[in-house]
Regions:
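Active-site-proximal beta-alpha core segment in soluble small-molecule metabolic enzymes
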Residues: 1-102, 107-113, 124-129, 137, ...
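Charged (often Lys/Glu-rich) extended helix/loop segments that serve as interaction or gating elements
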Residues: 125, 133, 139-450
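Active-site cleft segment of glycoside hydrolase catalytic domains centered on the general acid/base Glu
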Residues: 116-119
């Protein structure tokens, strides 16, 4: 009111209402009685009294509410809309010319494709149903009380922005569990545990598969215990380890042929998964995957005419053990492994991570000093794409500057060390030049592997 008088204007005023209704999913607490923002019913009345005292009652034009992000259940939205519509109707009946209602955000994204409220990464409604409910609720309430229909506004940031961005990551290297060569045969001189495990592996069959699995686990545990006490040598441990994983692979293959798979065999895929090390930082590019276990659709974006033959989890290149993805969207459930192709020598292999446009780039941090990635803006028209702009990612020099390291001073110090080392004969002049060149290339280059 003071600013309006000083500026000699009649302001347009809006009030955010704290509804008792709340959303569903990860952000349910953004709404309801314990939410951070908004005025309760009694606080709204107090605010109206202040407006009247200031002579600004005709300036109240909008009410706003927000019950959370990624609302999974349409019923929660309907309940909130009914409550908000009554607030609107009551204000109109009290003589306030409110003509705008901001329904806030919350329109979710079906990340996992299940169209189900059972998953926090999905929603059980369509955009059309959401719009229909918003409009129908306020129209019906307004008609019931004989008041004007309001202008409706929504702030569906996640649903609007999630689809606009794709993260493309290249696979650098893979790691697989050791397996025993098919031609291996246990010898009489081998340790008893090796011979026992070989017999299990050699005679594995569907009828005794579960018992064989239990016996293989017991032998492995016994071998590890004996090794820790110096009673089994490294060669024996390695043979048992490799043979155990070979047994696991065959048990997994047999289990997939069963109509009813025992519970303890359902997650062998996860145990056997390859590790695909990819050129990215989870904390910079997909922070919600780490922080709140958000699911994003991930698929290979090449060799799509080939059936994937491997299953993997994704590892980033940070030194943090949390830098991995081990939950993936599949046709009808969440899987712990991603079907992928085996790598070919000297041929790049790329994975696409989709629906990352909502907040991932903004939330990303400099964990391990991995900076912003290269980015490309692409537009599509009439079925054809056009590269509009290319943005280079951050360099090592730039991220070091963020943490108060002066790159120029670092180079000077290294130059002084190289000069001194050449002078004292520790390194040759050629070695000094190469060392400085490599250092500068690293310092002024991309924070990811090139």
């Amino acid at each position: 009111a003071q600013v309006a008088r000083r500026m000699k204007v009649r302001p347009n005023i809006g009030i955010r209402i704290k509804l008792a209704s709340s959303g569903s999913g990860k952000w349910a607490e953004s709404g309801g009685d314990m939410s951070k923002f908004g005025l309760t019913a009694s606080e709204v009345l107090a605010a109206l009294e202040k407006l009247e005292k200031a002579g600004l009652q005709d300036c109240l034009r909008l009410i706003h509410f927000h019950i959370g992000s990624q609302i999974t259940k349409i019923r929660r939205i309907q309940t909130a809309l009914n409550e908000a519509a009554e607030f609107y109707a009551n204000l109109r009946k009290m003589g306030y010319n409110v003509d705008f209602v901001d329904c806030g955000g919350g329109l979710g994204v079906d990340y996992d494709g299940t169209r189900s409220s059972n998953s926090e990464s999905s929603i059980n409604y369509s955009i059309q149903e959401y719009v229909n409910d918003c409009v129908d609720t306020f129209v019906e309430t307004a008609d019931k009380y004989g008041i004007p229909h309001p202008n409706l506004i929504t702030e569906s940031g996640r649903n609007l922005s999630a689809h606009h961005s794709v993260l493309v990551i290249d696979v650098l290297e893979t790691a697989s569990l050791p397996e025993m060569p098919e031609e291996f045969e246990a010898k009489e001189s081998d340790h008893k545990l090796v011979k026992d495990l070989y017999e299990i592996w050699d005679n594995l069959n569907p009828r005794t598969m579960l018992e064989d699995w239990h016996d293989a686990e017991q032998i492995r545990e016994e071998a590890l215990e004996l090794f820790s006490h110096g009673l089994v040598d490294l060669k024996t441990r390695a043979e048992i380890e490799s043979m155990y994983w070979s047994v696991c692979h065959e048990v997994n293959t047999l289990a997939k042929q069963m109509k009813h798979v025992p519970d303890e065999l359902r997650n062998i895929d996860k145990l056997l998964a390859d590790k695909y090390f990819c050129n990215f930082s989870l904390f910079q590019s997909l922070p919600d995957s780490w922080a709140i276990d958000q699911l994003f659709p991930i698929i290979p974006i090449q060799r799509l005419n080939e059936r994937p033959t491997r299953k993997c989890t994704i590892q980033d290149i940070t030194c943090d053990s949390d830098g991995k993805i081990a939950n993936f969207v599949t046709y009808n459930h969440v899987s712990h492994v991603l079907p992928v192709h085996s790598l070919r020598s000297k041929e790049p292999y790329y994975l696409g991570v989709f629906l990352v446009g909502a907040y991932q780039e903004i939330l990303g941090d400099l964990h391990n000093l991995f900076g912003d990635t290269n980015a490309v803006h692409i537009s599509v028209k009439d079925g054809k794409y056009r590269i509009d702009q290319v943005f280079e990612g951050e360099t090592v020099e730039e991220v070091l500057d963020y943490v108060q390291y002066d790159p120029k001073k670092l180079v000077r110090h290294l130059e002084q060390w190289v000069t001194k080392s050449v002078r004292t004969g520790k390194i040759s002049l050629e070695e000094g030049k190469n060392f400085l060149s490599n250092y500068r290339n690293g310092l002024y280059g991309y924070t990811y592997l090139e």
